[in-house]
C-alpha cells in the first residue's frame, strides 16, 4: 500500500522535535451540494526543529514514532 502524502500549514512548533500541521480538505456535501472545508491536525516528526509556525510543508506517512506521531516532513513549500 502506498504511503499517503499530504500538504498543510504548520500551526504549532512549540514541542521539541514535533510540529502540528493542519491539512485542509474540501468536498461537496452529498445532500446539500455545498462545498465544505474540513481541517485535520497531524503531529509530525521534525528531528532538527527546522520549521516554524506559518510554514507550508509536505508530509508523508511513516512508521509510528510515538502514540500520536506517524508522519515525517519531506518538503518545505515556503511561506
From Swiss-Prot:
- CDD domains recorded: Ribosomal_uS17
Q: Which InterPro entries match?
A: NA-bd_OB-fold, Ribosomal_uS17, Ribosomal_uS17_bact/chlr, Ribosomal_uS17_CS
Question: Which GO terms are recorded in the biological process aspect for this UniProt protein?
Answer: translation
Tell me the PROSITE patterns matching this sequence.
Answer: RIBOSOMAL_S17
Tell me any Pfam family this protein matches.
Answer: Ribosomal_S17
The record's keywords, sorted A to Z, are: Ribonucleoprotein, Ribosomal protein, RNA-binding, rRNA-binding
One GO cellular component term? cytosolic small ribosomal subunit
Lineage, top-rank taxon, reads Bacteria
**Which is an annotated GO molecular function term of this record?**
rRNA binding
This protein's assembly is summarised as: Part of the 30S ribosomal subunit.
Family label: Belongs to the universal ribosomal protein uS17 family.
Task: Extract the HAMAP family matched here.
Answer: Ribosomal_uS17_B (MF_01345_B)
What job does this protein perform?
Answer: One of the primary rRNA binding proteins, it binds specifically to the 5'-end of 16S ribosomal RNA.
Kindly provide the name given to this protein in its UniProt entry: Small ribosomal subunit protein uS17
Tell me the organism: Orientia tsutsugamushi (strain Ikeda) (Rickettsia tsutsugamushi)
Lineage here is:
Bacteria, Pseudomonadati, Pseudomonadota, Alphaproteobacteria, Rickettsiales
Gene for this protein?
rpsQ
Amino acid at each position: 500500500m502506498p504511503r499517503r502524502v499530504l500538504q498543510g500549514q504548520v500551526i504549532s512548533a512549540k514541542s521539541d522535535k514535533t510540529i502540528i500541521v493542519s491539512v485542509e480538505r474540501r468536498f461537496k456535501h452529498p445532500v446539500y451540494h455545498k462545498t465544505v472545508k474540513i481541517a485535520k491536525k497531524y503531529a509530525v516528526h521534525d528531528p532538527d526543529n527546522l520549521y516554524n509556525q506559518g510554514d507550508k510543508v509536505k508530509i508523508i506517512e511513516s512508521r509510528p514514532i510515538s502514540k500520536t506521531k506517524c508522519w515525517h516532513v519531506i518538503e518545505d513549500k515556503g511561506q
